[in-house]
Amino acid sequence: MDRNAVLYGVLEHRLPKWVELSDDTDLEPFFFSSVRYITAGSEDAIMIQALNLNTDEIVVFLVTNLNFMALIPTVYIENPGIRQLIASTPISYRSPITVFNGDLKKWMDCDLFVFGTMAAQKAFIKAGNSVLGSLGGNVYTYGDHVSNFDGNTPVLQNNLMCSHVYYTRYKTDVYAPWEFYYDQKRDQGYLMSLPAIIPRCKREGAFDIETIVHENAMDQDLNCQKFFKSEFRSMEESQVLIQRFREAGVTGLPPSPFVGITQKLHEIVSISLVVCNYHKTGPKKKEYYVYYNTKKMENPMEMIPVEHLHLDASRIKFEACKNEFYMLLAFINRLRKSVNVLYVYNAQFDIQVIQQRLRYYAFKQRAPRCCKGHDDIPHEWGKALMEKWEAFLSVKPQLFKAQILMGQDILKANYLKLLEGIGSVLAQAKSTMAKMCTIKERIDSYRKMKDTVQNFKSHGFGCDIIDMMYVCKRKEFEAKDGSLNTVAQLIIKKFKPHKATPKIHKMDDITYDKLDGYYRAGGTKIAECLIYNLIDSLLVIRIAKNLKPMEEYIYRQLACYNIDTAAHTRGVMNFCGFIQSTKVVEVSRNKARLDAGIVMATDYIRNSLFTPETIPRRGGFVMAPLTGLFFARPTQCFELCLDFTSMYPSMMCDLNISPETIVDSDKTNRVGDYMGYDWSKIDQGFEKFTLVLRVDRTDPENPKLVRHTSDTSLSLKRYLRLRTEHKRALKQSSGSVAEYHNRLQNEMKICTNTHYGVSEHTCSLMITTQGQHKIKLVNEFIKTLNRTGHSLFPNYGDTDSTMLYHPSDESETQLEDMVTLEDEMRAELREYMLKKLSAELVNRVKEKTKRTDTFVQSFLSDVETVLFDDMVEKLRLFSQGEVIEPFKDGGTWWVVDPLTGIWMDCSTPFSSELICKLEYENASSIGCHVAKKMYLSLVHELNNGEIINTKIKKRGMTGFKSSRFGATESITNDFMDLIFNGGALVKTGHLEALKPVTWAKLSAPADILHFSEPPVYENGICLNMNSITLIPHRVTAVTRLPCPDIKGGELVYVDLHESTSGKSSVLVLVLADGCALNHIFSSANVLHRELSFETIAMFRAFFVGAGFLDPNSIVFYERIPRLKPEFLSKITNYELFTGKKLKIPFVTLHKRKTTIQAIVKEDKKQIDYPEEWIKQDPAMAMFRRYPIDLRLERMIMDYFGSGLKCTLATFTPPKYTVSGERSRHSIVIKNHVDKHYLNDNSKFLAHVVMDRAMPTTCYIHDDIDVKAMIQSVISRVVRMIQDTQVRLQELSAAGNKLFHMFFNQLPPEMNNLDISFKYNPLVDHALQGQKGVPGLQYGNPEQIYTDMITEMTALLPRIGHMVEFMEWSQELSSSKTLCLLLPKIARDLNVPPLVTSLNDDTGNAMLIAFAHKIYIATAMLHILHGENLETHDLGPQTGTGVVGEPPKHCTGAQLREWFIDLQKTLALDAPSTHCAGCADFWLTHGSDPNFIEKMYRVNGGVFVRKIKKICL
């Protein structure tokens, strides 16, 4: 608590002393690195691990004589029961004190009682409430009785805060709180060097384990069935219950958490550990340890070269251990010696397995000869090993036993409760329908709980385990899959772009089906595995070094007064800090109560003044936007964004929204001398008040109103005040001091915003309801304004912000931004013309921004008065049973005090601490609203009318999310580069034949697309629109000069030459922070942007349809438990093994059978559709060229949204219902077209075409038949959009035709004539010359082929561990064969043509890229050579080599061919059956002489098999 708090004054002698120490003090400084509240015997204590900042010695303090408090109102002190209670209770200290009763809203005199233990406090409270209950009274505390179980509150109340510096004299005895000294200035001085303190007390390290993958490869000595049943009893119980419930008709059961790789016994074969030693000086501080189990190794380990991995072999300390037990022992001993912050990636596996193995060795219920592992390792040894682990997690395990909470364990416990609950419901004597309804409610409740479960939490003492998998889960690090390899590359490269490649990704993956063999073989094989294991630990530590989680952890502790408990997010939430949100607010509010003297009742609140609301939570107000693309070109205007600063936190302060300030409307007679805000006066309000002001009668003759405080407002204001102080200090500091202030100001912001998220239900309702009210009030005020003859209106609003267009200036004229050069023009004249034009263009930009800023300042001044008056007029004074309204006089709000008749000023005390204000955020000169919470804007931050910052703001657009798919990212980037940044299309001869390049990045020489003729405008209409095209222009020079009149400004002069006409010209561009501003003064510039985007869209349509887009963008990842067994079984047929993977990659085929049939051109009876047929392994699908679905409909949606309403047969053109002046506004017309003709979520191309088809003016001219003109505009817009969509679809279909000329092979499980998963080149159409191969729209096939060969050559060394190249032979073709290269491709790559997989990492981006380039190179050869393509001599059709099920549907000829193939297979030396089902079938029916008659019926010449299910 603060030193100026009343409570501190009362307890000063029992708390650490606030002092200002001199330099010659004999006290030593200690940094409290870990703090725990414990009970030691009969005493409560605070245990502190501390770093002596003078000596670097780490010590442990045990602090007793603590302070636990309870208060009894003085009016009850003489009650006999209370007197007896006081006499019989051990009380450490007693004192009178005046506090504020947060429940009854009044100040009261109390007696403060201090106890040495929490048990004594609780016993006193319980007994006191028993006595006072009949009298209508309560025992009170400062709120700690609701939150003291985690240790935060005892630590807070005794002022011994974690991660702060205290002074004391060291001793070995126990301490009392008052033996510590706190010097705030010195504490802050030390904390400014926090990065230097952390390594001295936090010894960081990272580890990773490797286990035996296949259960049948495990050491059978470790197979103890008694331990297995004990460990997985719950799993077996759940399986039995699930089966029983399904038989009883229960549906919709959520997936069981008793699945996954942790739900089995494991054998750890190696553990790698990297010890950072950041506290040491000099190079090579890190120590590398690798512990490995030699028990089953056939040969000693032989080291392999590691220099290419940037590793120094001499620094790696390998420790061979004779079995798993000794390996764990060596590992834990090293942890205890060198590490107290342990990083791991996916603790749910690594830590879970470590603890499983420790439980195995410490298993007490073992029986004689239950397993050899238990015979070899006595129980006492196992118990001692477990104790060592516990001593690592807590340096004082005898006083504080550490806890590790796993999300999966919580889920399992709750899942079992769900199943038990369902069982009890089924046993009830109710109707089946009633039971099923109850069961559904329980299932829904479980599903909601599942999303909020704490994922991982480490609660030790002097030790933290940090799971970097959760720490990395942030918006700024969105990765397609959460693997360590993917995340490490993303993060390390982001922070260290020049980091050596081997240091940012895992070692080349070792195939999971070979991993066990490598470990057992020993030699160089195990060396590979051990280095692989070590690199995983190194990646984890490198991620941690960049993200600095310990700094983040401690800064959050400093901000919110929490002790060190590392929680790792909940459910699927992104990481937002180690301290739980509830703790951030809870502890801060506790501190506010201690500082302000606010107390709370500890039992049922008697005489409560408010009843909690029960209606559902509300969200913020989101106004449906006026959708469409807009430019602030001549006669059009900027979109202004106004927002409330920290809206929710500031409203909580302004209106004092907190549980202890709420009073029901019918109970105001019990609250005197307060002024409350009447919540019933706003829409969707409540019959409640919050106390905002109180009457100060210090001078009885002159009462006045002052602000009333609450614990919430105090907590929030503290965060807001400290953030302001840190931001101010940040501007005046540098280096580590600046880092300190910057980190803390950001922490204060996060903690401030957290208050709303964890607020009580009634408070939450008040906050969001008031937020809606404010935004709607501002929007209504905007509608009352009329500027430059035009009425204003809001066009979008979201929660705390509103957007509107500032008044347009219809007198604005177009400016030319291009100078045509005459052949004989002198350099001096050219320079003069360009200089004059540049000045004119820049001045136009400045004039427009100045007008915008002038309007905004005037508007804000007016709206501030409206908002203030709206709040104050709803205040009511409670006095003498009356409810008195305020009134306004002379610009000030007053209320009359009924006791004295004095006018009391309401305005001054209310406004003095007012925080929530509407402010000018930015102005957008380009914007596109697509739907609610979905928009892109080119925003400019203005200061005194001048641009000081320009950037693109994006909200809710899929192209920037991890859910983006296919071409979405490319299309979004095209939109940004061409429409928002401003740029041109550069022509290349390569695969990416048209490439958007912003003007900021354009260089000479280059060929760009520009106008075939200059646009001519009249009354906002481009007269020559139909004749304008974009044609190549040669960029001969690009000159760049600074533009000092615009911050971040640049003038760019682009010299263009058009070869057909021979004309030369210079394009002048005004840039701000790399974004072109020419649209502000030139509609021609806008047209160029739009035509460029339409052109690239048409190019993308063919490009994406032809499958030229990076195929990694269509690879999905799914968690293994969510994948059906059929898919997992299918990929094992390719000899792929899932191993320890958390997620499996896949691509999807076309969904419709008819589409597949049309692509593969096979009889539909030959095509089967097994379960999960649509999912395919990425590598197999890409190399073998299955009919992959490129999701072209997704591309169409990115361009046009979900579909055009106006093309439906039932469509009727709607009436244009907007009337008045607004009906002529361009954005209103666009919104009408979008909503009624297009769809509710139309996208980029539709908006571009719409804007191009509209007049360039802000308003349709009213000197003609406006209604007819608007209808004509709408008709033209819709027609252009429809024509554009048809053209795009045609190009897409043409590209897709090319793609499916090659990607048309039928996957094995879909071909009922061939159940072998071997690669068959005879059905690969890419290996045969073809007729009618479509040509390219853009690009040179020869150049593209050469590019692909070059890129594949560069990839070959990087995929050497993934694929093997062999000479073509039918015998070498197997289920792991990927494809056969065309002869020319193989020659040009200098590799044999047959490509075979060596690896299970079939989602690897490089492998997929290699397959993609093979396809493109193959397609280019087909385009170049057609039927004359050079091919292989493949020989005759060969057999499958596998005895499988007979065809389900076939002709007589096909059945005969199948039996011939079967005969060849049976003639092999060792024929094999496809599966157990096939084997059983042939054993039963194979010798039947009437096989065909019994197995088949003939229907219309087609043989149909009678037995449907054979193959498993």
Curated annotation (Swiss-Prot):
It is found in: Host nucleus. It comes from the Viruses. Its main location: host cell. GO terms for biological process: DNA replication; viral DNA genome replication. It is an enzyme of class 2 (transferase). GO terms for cellular component: host cell nucleus. PROSITE patterns: DNA_POLYMERASE_B. The keyword Nucleotidyltransferase applies. It catalyses: DNA(n) + a 2'-deoxyribonucleoside 5'-triphosphate = DNA(n+1) + diphosphate. Belongs to the DNA polymerase type-B family. This is DNA polymerase. It comes from Ictalurid herpesvirus 1 (strain Auburn) (IcHV-1).
